[in-house]
Regions:
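Conserved N-terminal catalytic core of the sugar/cofactor nucleotidyltransferase
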Residues: 1-4, 26, 30-120
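N-terminal nucleotide-binding beta1-loop-alpha1 segment
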Residues: 1-18
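Short beta-strand/turn micro-motifs composed of small residues
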Residues: 9, 52, 100, 129-130
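Short glycine-enriched loop/turn motifs at secondary-structure junctions
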Residues: 17-19, 99, 169-173
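Short glycine-enriched, charge-decorated loop/helix-capping segments at active-site entrances
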Residues: 20-24, 192-195
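Conserved beta-strand scaffold positions in the cores of enzyme catalytic domains, especially
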Residues: 24, 69, 125-127
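Conserved core of the sugar-phosphate nucleotidyltransferase
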Residues: 57, 65, 106-197
Length: 198
């Protein structure tokens, strides 16, 4: 089974109020994206695909020819960003890891376990989740009675539902790291609604 990895790095990181692109800020002595890239590179069978946007020069200068680059011209959400990699990956990989480029604490071992879990299960998607505080801004992982993930509910959406308190009390949070069965991913990504980035 061939594994590909996509790192989403097209965002501006405007909340950081910096001229430096968010993924290029240093953590632990090196740029955030380099931590994630090296973890993905150790698990992937192909050079990781990095989705870039405006200000891509710094990312390209840092990663050089170790990465394959695709450009997301319009910021229309993470599903759309992932879709930008279809032309370079469709038919080349059996599994596709997708993660954000600003996750410096993500470890290669965690990615390897996620890939193995998706491969061994009958699920088309496997995701990493974390246990956190009820006050977190991360999406909540909602599970059915049998333990299967039924949905991921973002905080803004949870606040508009009748069971807001119940949803926001969930401590299992979506880490934003996924492993997909490749064919399923490419067949279903176009069905996602486009969302203008915040």
């Amino acid at each position: 089974m061939t594994v590909a990895a996509i790192l989403l790095a097209a965002g501006h990181g405007t909340r950081m109020n910096s001229k430096t692109q968010k993924v290029l800020h240093g953590v632990g002595g090196k740029p955030m994206i380099l931590h994630v890239f090296e973890a993905a590179e150790s698990v992937a069978d192909l050079p990781p695909v990095v989705v870039v946007g405006a200000g891509e020069e710094g990312v390209r200068a840092l990663l050089g020819e170790r990465a394959t680059y695709v450009v997301q011209e319009q910021r229309l959400g993470t599903g759309h960003a992932t879709l930008m990699a279809e032309d370079v990956l469709r038919g080349r990989a059996d599994q596709v890891l997708v993660t954000y480029g600003d996750m410096p604490l993500l470890r290669a071992g965690s990615l390897a376990k996620l890939v193995a879990e998706q491969r061994q299960s009958s699920a088309v998607i496997a995701l990493l989740s974390v246990l956190g505080d009820a006050g977190s801004s991360f999406g909540r992982v909602v599970r059915a009675a049998d333990g299967a993930v039924s949905e991921i509910v973002e905080v803004a959406e949870a606040r508009q539902r009748a069971n807001t308190a119940e949803l926001l009390a969930i401590r299992e949070l979506n880490a934003g790291v996924y492993c997909f069965e490749a064919g399923w991913l490419w067949d279903n990504l176009p069905r996602l609604p486009l969302r203008q980035a915040r």
